[in-house]
A protein has these predicted regions:
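Single conserved hydrophobic/aromatic residue that forms the stacking wall/gate
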Residues: 217-225
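Pyridoxal 5′-phosphate
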Residues: 1-218
Length: 225
């Protein structure tokens, strides 16, 4: 079979599979423990963090590993709204986001949030001017994917970031970059992105490993509810 559907998932290269296997066999210690096998696991996690952070233009402590892209999206949106709760209860997103974003927004509407869903044009594109028109004084979050998972359209996330900065908006910017990783350059600091979600299996990594990234002033949670 000739496999071309890398937007759905990607094969794991042998070197990645070997790295996972080696970790399962010889690096299985509890990273919180103080004996050698624990230190080995702790060092491996730290090295992985540094590698990913260098690729994304952020600090290693701003990375959180989750189980899937949907969890990353849910977590990022709710974190942004919680920490930016004094800005207001308005969200801007697109009508063609991944269901993890759309379903979260629907749930948030039931919790009292107002959500503006931007519709794409006939070519599937969304423009920064649409975001500008929808922007309100009480907008707390703009969440927009970087690349659409069905059409392949690239959304103007960097332009939206510049817009929010120029308007001195209090809104935070989250982007689901799951389909963009490995295809488009990503630099969280340079592109003024507050939160970003990735999923390893979309760019030849193992399934069940995803990363929501918090860049600017957001404080990552220290406990699970």
């Amino acid at each position: 079979m000739i496999y071309l559907d890398h937007a759905a998932t990607t094969p794991v290269p042998e070197e990645v599979a070997h790295a996972v296997y080696d970790t399962l066999v010889s690096g299985w210690g509890n990273p919180s423990s103080q004996y050698p096998i624990g230190k080995q696991a702790r060092d491996a996690v730290a090295a992985a963090r540094e590698t990913i952070a260098a690729a994304l233009g952020c600090k290693s402590e701003q990375l959180v590993f989750t189980s899937c892209g949907s969890e990353s999206d849910n977590w990022a949106v709710r974190l942004a709204l919680h920490q930016n709760r004094h800005a207001g209860k308005h969200i801007i997103t697109t009508a063609v986001e991944h269901s993890a974003i759309l379903e979260t927004c629907k749930a948030l509407e039931q919790e009292g949030y107002s959500v503006t869903y931007l519709k794409p044009d006939k070519n599937g594109d969304i423009t920064a001017s649409q975001v500008e028109s929808a922007l309100r004084d009480d907008t707390a979050l703009v969440t927009m994917m970087l690349v659409n998972n069905e059409t392949g359209c690239i959304f103007p996330v960097a332009e939206v970031a510049q817009l929010l900065k120029a308007k001195k908006s209090r809104a935070l910017l989250h982007t689901d970059a799951v389909q963009a990783a490995g295809h488009l350059p990503i630099d969280i600091k340079a592109q003024n992105i507050d939160l970003l979600s990735l999923s390893a299996h979309k760019f030849h990594g193992p399934k069940g490993t995803c990363v929501p990234v918090s860049y600017t002033h957001l404080t990552l949670p220290t406990k699970l509810e």
